[in-house]
Amino acid sequence: MNIITLLTEQAQIRPHQPAIIDFPQRKRRVLTFVELEQAATHSAGLFQQSGLQVGDVVLIFQPMSAELYIALAGIFRLGLVAMFIDPGQGLRHIAQCCASQPPKAVLASNIVHRLLALSPTLRRIPLKFAVEELAVQAKSVPKFAPLGRRAWQTHRQTVQHPHYFSAQASDPALLTFTSGSTGHPKAALRSHDFLMSQHQVIAECLALTTGSVSLATMPIVLLSNLAQGITSVIPAGDLRSPGKTDPALLATLIQAENVSSTVASPALLERLADYCQTQQQTLPSLCKIFIGGAPVFPKTLQRLQQVASHAEIVTIYGSTEAEPMAKIAFNQVQMADVQAMLAGGGVLVGVPVPAIRLAILPDRWGKPLLPMSQSEFECLQCSRGVVGEIVVSGAHVLSGYLHGKGDAESKFRVNGSSWHRTGDAGYLDGQGRLWLMGRCSARLQDERGKTYPFAVECALSQLPAVQRSAFLSHNARRVLVVQITDASASLCERLKGVLFPFRKRVQPIIAPTLDLTKLKAWVAWAQVDEIRVFKHIPLDVRHNAKVDYPALYKRLERWDGFFHHLGCFIGGFKHALGLLKH
């Protein structure tokens, strides 16, 4: 079944209900379900008129907006494949992605097209569509488009394509990319059947009321909202950087549009909670808050509950290849669970969703797993409470990557069925709930035993003075890196003696152990050798919430190199002074 049929059904059931409310150029715009359906038939007509055929790939560089979903609906209707690449990864990354599945067309704004002209790979794409904001309700169409590009607004003048491609289960629909352990992009190709299964699982997981209003910050969730008849509000701003969103705008928008639910990154929701608490403001319309995409610590959940006291706050665990995997409501977290998290037990993410099969295998990340029988698989699984690698299988779990690139490191088979290796370490407790311990590749293992970073990050997250932390092995030493909050004046006072005159140019400060003994004692079980304080700990680009450990390693190396050269300079200077005295 073609995923577009669900949108067509909603246009018939609730034609005049708003499907998308967005704010191009800060102006409120409403697109109803029937308007979305009509625009989709026109966009499909434009693609067909341009010569695109079933199976052709359309590369999209377009932020969350009405235009994005009109384009997607037209693409799915015609049986084309939508390709998404993160432009923030650079032109080399884009070229690698396009080489794996060359697109026949690219859709982007005129501004983005000018930047893409720097890429020989993108210049070779035959068809180029230029999107301008306010295209949905534009009363006139520009008489010209930039050289070599076709104005997206002309879809309003093309003949409608009312029929949709009758998709088979395996027909491709959506192509995205994720980085493997080698750094080369892996292509995740989702079929119409996969998108249908994922929508069903997301809908069951969120259990939103048809006709309600949801603040949309994640593209795949908005697509599921449309299929379920839920109004999606897209806030103004760049949602690709959730940690930089305007919290005042979000709070105002939630109240003005009577938003009852949202699915968002911890970085976005933390900023919203900060703002509301500072302004002594609450969000009474919110009934459900779903938070995921990065580790969610108890302190964040507590603050959100204070801001939205009537809301059910739910943590969701998932990944690009399997979304969602597990969930837990904050009101289900007991005091004993919080104490376990503070004592190094990791992050509680709840019971696996019914649609997924989840198991814990011994942590052998980096080594391929050979095909095995069901009995061999069951014998290999870890006992309850034992930390290992999380593996999953299900209809909404990606069974393999395009051309098999990346399958060896992250896929294996049990009785012929595909299983996905998440690369995350965790364990199942006695109640069958999943606890996360961090990335398998980030584990610390030495003569003192094995420790995972999330255990330390979660424990320190409850301290008011610590905004963020990271735990890693560096030069055979267990190093704790902390980022302090702006309000932690007492800690800053203790560190005042080690701040350098040029601290604005050099971010990390090595903190004397004696000054941070309480911090070290808080995680005594981690046996920390050294504590360093950073002005900012590097985070992942996508959610702005997960510690970017490779970037942190590089920063530590640069900092150590700086001190090495500084030491050599001081040593040489002292030696020269000694010679002068003689």
Predicted segments with their positions:
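Conserved C-terminal "lid"/linker of ANL adenylate-forming enzymes
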Residues: 517-581
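Structural core segment of the AMP-binding/adenylate-forming
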Residues: 77-150, 476, 517
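Conserved AMP-binding A3 loop
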Residues: 30-34, 164-167, 173-197, 231
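Conserved AMP-binding/adenylation subdomain of ANL enzymes
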Residues: 81, 195-213, 218-260
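Conserved ATP-binding/catalytic segment of the ANL
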Residues: 61, 376-447, 462, 473
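Conserved AMP-binding/adenylate-forming
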Residues: 29, 44-88
